């Protein structure tokens, strides 16, 4: 079992499987750090007002989606008796995941797999591959289809 796990979530199709895998890897005294990384191009500043949300609807939608993903994940894990906290940072997902894992001294990172083709990877780099290459700890990738 692992004590400090970082679980990267994006609300994608593998969301439930990633959460289940992370909960399975957690021990009775483990803490899961749930992470949903916002694109900085569309992130609202801390303390954003309703006027800001109306002015930047794409940012408001992204933030609301990420907050909902984390709230649902926290509720599910707490229902299972797993200690978890959530974070909503901005930045490049791979870089943020690796930096947070280093800062938190994580024993394990749990992520999903988007099953990109080689062509898709040319235009949309793999967060998972970047994380594997730069992580300070083992990375467990959920590869099963949802």
Give a label for each model feature:
Residues 33, 85, 140:
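Conserved beta-strand positions in the Rossmann-like core of class I SAM-dependent methyltransferases
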Residues 24, 99-146:
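Gly/Ser-rich helix-loop-strand patches that form or flank binding pockets
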Residues 17, 96, 118:
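Phosphate- and divalent-cation-binding pockets in alpha/beta enzyme and binding domains
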Residues 75-109, 146:
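Structural beta-alpha unit
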Residues 53-68:
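A short acidic, glycine-rich active-site loop
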Residues 15, 66-67, 90, 121:
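A conditional alpha-helix N-cap/helix-loop micro-motif detector
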Residues 1-53:
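Small/aliphatic-rich secondary-structure junction motif
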